Amino acid sequence: MQALQSIIDNAFEQRAEITPDNVEPQVRDAINNVIAQLDSGKLRVAEKINGQWVTHQWLKKAVLLSFRISHNQVIDGSESRYFDKVPMKFANYDQARFEKEGFRVVPPAAVRQGAYIARNTVLMPSYVNIGAYVDEGSMVDTWATVGSCAQIGKNVHLSGGVGIGGVLEPLQANPTIIEDNCFIGARSEIVEGVIVEEGSVISMGVYIGQSTKIYDRETGEIHYGRVPAGSVVVSGNLPSKDGRYSLYCAVIVKKVDAKTRGKVGINELLRTID
């Protein structure tokens, strides 16, 4: 693995000069190897090690390099035709392989090669970009988008129209992460490498980036870039220092543990926020 990483790191330093026509075979093979392992889930761009999320920057570099080594080509789909550098993940799947891998894909859901989809996941008409990781038992609902290299945990529900930001455009240092057992409400956006920790509930229409104030109304604490575990979050506003105007923020209205979450439905958690 160290040799593979070295090839990727060195190639990334010369990325501006790499084209599909001049890329060295060793570099092409290394990039394709990484994309295949991301696709199968053997590698992932970020993982939790000793309780902390670690981003493997060299894998992100390989994803970026993959766009340098391929020409656009026609891609056939059931509803249309496409013209892109990245093949679709399911292009060569047959019924036996779908059954073996154990997830559902509802048309016209689109998943790029290099994204991993785990067992018991349901993809409604949605989009999952290259390098993303969607873990077991999760639901990616209609018109939701999982951005490049984003990490989605087990038993996560991404509601209709949710946007989970990627790392490629604009270029971000770390992927957006949604940990296990989270619920992200319809039309919410979580971007710029924000981490939503385990068991959190994000209400409909909440927008969180690195500069968004995440205000805990019980403690008065303000978080940036991280939603603490077990938070129930709604959209809100905080007044300016001079009191002349207010600016958008996300508000943690309560904290719940796994036991409470198991007994109380998501809708009930969001209704009782006064």
Curated annotation (Swiss-Prot):
Family annotation (SUPFAM superfamilies): Trimeric LpxA-like enzymes
Transmembrane feature ranges: none
Key word Acyltransferase present: yes
An annotated Gene Ontology molecular function: 2,3,4,5-tetrahydropyridine-2,6-dicarboxylate N-succinyltransferase activity
Enzyme class: transferase
UniProt pathway annotation: Amino-acid biosynthesis; L-lysine biosynthesis via DAP pathway; LL-2,6-diaminopimelate from (S)-tetrahydrodipicolinate (succinylase route): step 1/3
Source organism superkingdom: Bacteria
NCBIfam families recorded: dapD, PRK11830.1
Similarity-based family: Belongs to the transferase hexapeptide repeat family.
Annotated HAMAP family: DapD
Protein name in the entry: 2,3,4,5-tetrahydropyridine-2,6-dicarboxylate N-succinyltransferase
Taxonomic source organism: Proteus mirabilis (strain HI4320)
